Each structure stands twice: as structure tokens, then as C-alpha cells.
């Protein structure tokens, strides 16, 4: 499998997500803590999968997902706690 990008500010979540993606065959997932940095990295590298773990320190995270869908060919997974999901409605 190709490369994966994890956009998440949570250290424990990052380790867990990276370990699961590695088990699935993704090579060394890249971990980015902010939406702004994630957008920059998406223009510099090709990723097969992008996982956004919301919220991010500089934004909620759905904006990164929309940007990824519009500007990359990667699959996108958006993780959000049920209690925070209402912010998207």
C-alpha cells in the first residue's frame, strides 16, 4: 500500500492510528498536528489515505477533509467524537 497522512493533535491517538495503518500495510504514516500544515503537505506529497482526527488546534477538521477530497485522489477518513458531531450540522 501507499503512504498515509494522519492529521491529529492527540499524541496517544496518533500512535494508535499509525500502528493500525502500519498493520494494514501503509508505509510509515506521516503525522501532522494542524490543518494548515496538512494542506501544505498534501501539495508536496501524494498520499493514498488521509485520516483527520478532529478537532485540530487551528480548526475543526472538516475543512481539511473537504480540501483533500477536492485536491487529491486520496481516500479520506474523518474521525469526530459524537458529542462534537453536532458542530457540523
Question: What is each model feature region?
Answer:
Residues 75-77:
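Proline-centered loop/turn at the N-terminus of a beta-strand
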Residues 48-72, 84:
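Conserved phosphotransfer microenvironments
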Residues 13-14, 34-37, 57, 82-87:
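Negatively charged, flexible loop motifs adjacent to catalytic sites
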Residues 18, 31-49:
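Acidic, metal-coordinating helix/loop segments flanking the phosphotransfer/catalytic sites
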Residues 19, 62-63, 80-89:
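Alpha4 helix (beta4-alpha4-beta5 surface) of REC/receiver domains from two-component response regulators
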Residues 11-30:
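Two-component/phosphorelay signaling modules centered on CheY-like receiver
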Residues 7-9:
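Conserved acidic carboxylate
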Amino acid at each position: 500500500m501507499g503512504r498515509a497522512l494522519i492529521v491529529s493533535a492527540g499524541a496517544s491517538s496518533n500512535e494508535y492510528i499509525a500502528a493500525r495503518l502500519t498493520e494494514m500495510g501503509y508505509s510509515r504514516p506521516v503525522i501532522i498536528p494542524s490543518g494548515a500544515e496538512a494542506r501544505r503537505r498534501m501539495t508536496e506529497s501524494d498520499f493514498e489515505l488521509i485520516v483527520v482526527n478532529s478537532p485540530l488546534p487551528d480548526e475543526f477538521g472538516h475543512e481539511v477533509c473537504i480540501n483533500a477530497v477536492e485536491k487529491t485522489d486520496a481516500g479520506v477518513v474523518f474521525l469526530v467524537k459524537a458529542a462534537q458531531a453536532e458542530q457540523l450540522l
